[in-house]
Amino acid sequence: MANAIIEKANQRFEQSFQSLSREYASIRAGRANASLLDRIQVEYYGVPTPLNQLASITVPEARVLLISPFDKSSIKDIERAINASDLGITPANDGSVIRLVIPALTEETRKELAKEVKKVGENQKIAIRNIRRDAMDEAKKQEKNKEITEDELKALEKDIQKATDQAIKHIDGMTSEKEKELLTV
């Protein structure tokens, strides 16, 4: 029973790490990366559709993304969705493909993005602490129902805290790595 609580918490921690990775991948660092476009939804025949399902996205050069729509008639919709997004990149449409030239980041933009990275990391740490709280509540409930002893509860709480500390340390590492990537010119 006790191991099941820690196992469940660890699975939720892992989901948080994956979520944070996806979030960080979508924050542009001055280099072209197809995951920048992951959050873009295109209005395609009245249905919001992820861009990566409507087109192939390639990186021909370090700061260029090339979007090749599978259906050429959707090119205007894709262009409209990119313009409406918060990317701050203007698409260049040549009729069959869309080019996105990623501008070099200014020092000010880098610092703003670093703040955003910190904020996202903090939100993820809050999620980790909520997972810890849920695990602790579950352990206390088991102790109250006499499924585990008070000593087992203390040991379990200690293990949960240790796992939480490791998860927060991992998030701190991911955050500082992304900040370093952003602030490197």
From Swiss-Prot:
GO terms for cellular component: cytoplasm. It is found in: Cytoplasm. The keyword Repeat does not apply. Keywords: Cytoplasm, Protein biosynthesis. One of its GO terms (molecular function) is ribosomal large subunit binding. The keyword Cytoplasm applies. It comes from the Bacteria. Gene3D superfamilies: 3.30.1360.40, Ribosome-recycling factor. InterPro entries: Ribosome_recyc_fac, Ribosome_recyc_fac_dom, RRF_sf. GO terms for biological process: translational termination. Transmembrane segments: none annotated. PANTHER family: MITOCHONDRIAL RIBOSOME RECYCLING FACTOR PSEUDO 1, RIBOSOME RECYCLING FACTOR. Belongs to the RRF family. Responsible for the release of ribosomes from messenger RNA at the termination of protein biosynthesis. May increase the efficiency of translation by recycling ribosomes from one round of translation to another. This is Ribosome-recycling factor. It comes from Streptococcus uberis (strain ATCC BAA-854 / 0140J). The lineage of its organism: Bacteria, Bacillati, Bacillota, Bacilli, Lactobacillales. The gene is frr.
